[in-house]
Structures are given as C-alpha cells and as structure tokens.
Amino acid sequence: TEAAAVLLPTEMEIDENPKISVMFLSYGFSSVGPFREYIHIIHARFRGEEVGFVPHIFISNERGMLAGREREGYPKLLGDIDFDMHQPNVYGLITAQLSRPAGVVLVQGLFRPSEFLGEITADKPTVIKALGLRVVGSAVPGGPLSVCEFVPSALEFIAGEIWSGDGSLMFTGASEFSALHRLPIVGGVEATAFYNSSFRLRRPTKTYPFDA
C-alpha cells in the first residue's frame, strides 16, 4: 500500500494492498504506425469513481510517446518491448519482456492460455478507465505550473477473444532509473489475454484541475 501511495496524487484513494495491473500490448497498425506498449496501472478511486492511475508506461514508437505525453498526460518513455502473441514456441507459452535500454530487462512475463471465455463485441465492450496527470511547467524558472490537471480517458475494447490462463510476472530490479520493482508483487497473479482485439480510445470531455 505504501509503495503505491507514494506514486499517487493526493486526491486519489486506494484500498489496503491495492490491485495493480500490467498490460503488454501489440498494435498492428495505428495513426502513428505499428508499435508495442507496456502499461502499469494502480487501481484507485478519484472522486468516488473507480479508475486506473498510470505511473509507468513505455512505448516503442516516438510519435506515440509524444502524443500520449502532451495530450493525455501519461508519463510515456521509449522502451524496447518484446511481445508477439503469434510467435510460436515449443512450450506453448506467450512471452513478454520490457527492456530499457535494450539488453537491460525490467519486466518479464509468461502466459499459458487454458480456456476461451468468449467474444468481445461492440455491444458488450470491455472498458479500462485510466487517469493521467498532465503537467506543463512554467517558462519562468521557479514560476507556477502552467498546466496541472487530471485527464480521464479509457480503452474501449470492441472486438476480439478473451482467454484465461496461468500467468507469471517478474520485476527484475535491474535499473533504478526505471524502478518498476518498487511496486512489488505481494499476492497471486491473475492473467487474461485479449486476442485479435480491436479498441478505440475514449477521449476526455473534461479535465480536473489539480493543485500540486
């Protein structure tokens, strides 16, 4: 709980031993081209609503990094992400890995699919709500922040297959420059895969000022 609280803005609330999610995503094509992404989410509450706060997010595409930082306030950094659900191997496992820089592994994940749970449809989408903190500093040294606001958005999955299975996740602690391991795994790991999925980004209709 303390490790998560350190990363959360004061206006957000969390439960004891809050749920933490890790997402590896592979985008076959998008408005910024194909890329891969790693998203680290702390499940919390903001003004009584369940949301996910994103303290760490890595992406393999520079244009996507810039758009996410400037528009939604996500702390996107470039990273080397190895994740391909179509890559065959003799073990029947899906592997995922985040490195920054290349060769310095920060996160390793394994997924062993076991059961098809159903289809995602536009009529019954799966929605993951998230909250970014958009900060723009003052041009004047020591001056007040020009922008400091919470920006809500959501990933709305509208197609694809949902699979359950067994998961394994490890934070290596290899780098204090990208210290993802400071959010330790203290309970069991639940794993789900969205296969051949499509989603759309729900853009915000309003933002919320934050007095940092």
Predicted regions and their residues:
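N-terminal domain-onset segments
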Residues: T1-E37, M170, P184, N196-S198, ...
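N-terminal start-of-chain detector that recognizes signal peptides
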Residues: E11-E16, P55, L66-G68, F171-G173
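Broad gene-expression machinery/nucleic-acid interaction feature
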Residues: K19, E37-I41, V54, L78-D80, ...
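Hydrophobic/aromatic-rich structural module bridging two neighboring secondary-structure elements via a short loop
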Residues: M23-E72
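Interaction-surface and assembly-scaffold signal
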Residues: G68-A212
